[in-house]
Each structure stands twice: as structure tokens, then as C-alpha cells.
Amino acid sequence: MGEELLVYDSVEICFNGRPAVRDVSFSLSPGEILCIVGESGSGKSTLLRAAIGLLGRAGMVTRGDIWFQGENIPDLPERRLQKIRGSRIGMIFQDPAASLCPVRTVGSQMTESLRAHGPISRKEAKERSLALFDKLGLKGGERIWECRPFELSGGMNQRVGIAMAMLLNPCVLLADEPTSALDAVMGRQAVLELLALREHFGTAILLVTHDMGTAAAMADRILVLKDGTAAEYGPAGQVLAAPKSRYTRELLEAVPSLE
């Protein structure tokens, strides 16, 4: 597997015995951004959640392997997966409400996240969080720390979600449609912040999107999914400039301009 951090090898995922993803293989290297692109229902988010064992009771990896730093994720007990989540693999959800309690302060939630992986004082947690806010360009860190998510905009909550996911400096970040609930301006801001994570921390990012334009702006490699199978996979420049799949060409035609 060489330098690869995350390797999906001929993966099949079923829900209640029915395949949602079939025979999908790809890998993610340190510092790389890999975008998984496809329409709703193609299996993108399912692939992402499988990397941290969040398929729910009905979901199961029924064939293949998902290797992360020498460990096969489908074989790991829940206790081991809990150690990996956050500290080694972080995740940004499509809806910030999925990861933030609306009535507890951002500071209390960030402190709790840090304490789940080791003892830390509230003062130390605040210092670490404010330093991260500053690196990510979030102005007014003190105010954000004291706010409850319902007092912040959707765009700011998404940015807080990015900060939460990076608290423990994981080597891999999973991002599930991080721009889909944002307007165009905030969507561009989220893209820039994700690119900054790689620049500042060397984070490898596995990003799910239905928007080929977002993939064009970010990806080193692209995996195109259609009905749970890989329609195309390769370097972003190659997939964008000379797509082999008709489905990939259709997705590209839906993007007004990649300039």
C-alpha cells in the first residue's frame, strides 16, 4: 500500500442485505484531496461513513476491505473505532446540526470533544480552540467560543464544524457535501478553508460532492460514482479534460464554466 493512508479495496456495502455500493476501489495519500462525485443516491456518503464505521445497524461492508494505517476498518470493534474518530479521522457533515448541539456553547462542545481523547482543562481547550480559529481565519474567536450554534449563521456553523473536526489534527478529514447547504459566497469560503487545511496541516481530504465544479476547484483525483459503482477514477486533470465515461461528461456539461 506504500504511502497510502486510506485504501478501499473492492468494497461492497449493503443495507438490509441490498447492495448500495458495489466493487469500489480507490486510495487516499497524505496531503491529497480526493473528490467523490455523483448524483444523490449514488452511494457517495455511504462510502465516506464506512471509513469510520458509521453505517448504522442496517449497513455493513459485505465484501472487500477498508485499510487505514494498517488496520481494516470493518474488522475493528466499536471501542477502537471511537479512538480513531476525531483523533485520526475527522468528519464534516453536510448539516452542521448533525455534529453541533444548538443550545450548548461552542466552547463547551469543543472542550468535550478534546476531553473524549484525554484530560484537558477548559482553559487549555479554549487556548487550543482560539488558536485554531485564528489559523482558519475565523474572526471574533472569543465571541464564537461563547455563542450557541443557534445564535450563529449556517455558514458560520459550517466553519465551526470544520474547526471541530480539526481539533485533534487528524491526518484524514472526511467532508460530506460541505458546501451544499451554503450560498455561493459561503460555499467558496468553505472551499478555501478546506484548501487551507492541507496547506497548514498537510491534511488528506476525502470530499463528497454532487458538484463537479467544486471537484474541479479542489481535487487531485476524482472518483465518479453512478448507481453505487465507479464510473470513472483518475487524476483530476485527466478526468476533467478527457473523461472516458459518458456519465462523467454529462456531469461536466452541467457546470457552466470551470475557469
Where are these regions (language model features)?
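Conserved ABC transporter NBD signature motif
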Residues: M60-N72
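The feature captures the beta-strand-to-loop junction immediately N-terminal to the Walker
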Residues: V37-E39
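H-loop/switch region of ABC-family ATPase nucleotide-binding domains
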Residues: T209-H210
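ABC ATPase "signature
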Residues: A230-G234
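Conserved ABC ATPase signature
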Residues: R148-L152, M156
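A short, surface-exposed alpha-helical micro-motif characterized by mixed small hydrophobic
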Residues: A215-A217
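A short, proline-enriched helix->beta-strand linker immediately N-terminal to the Walker B motif
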Residues: L167-C171
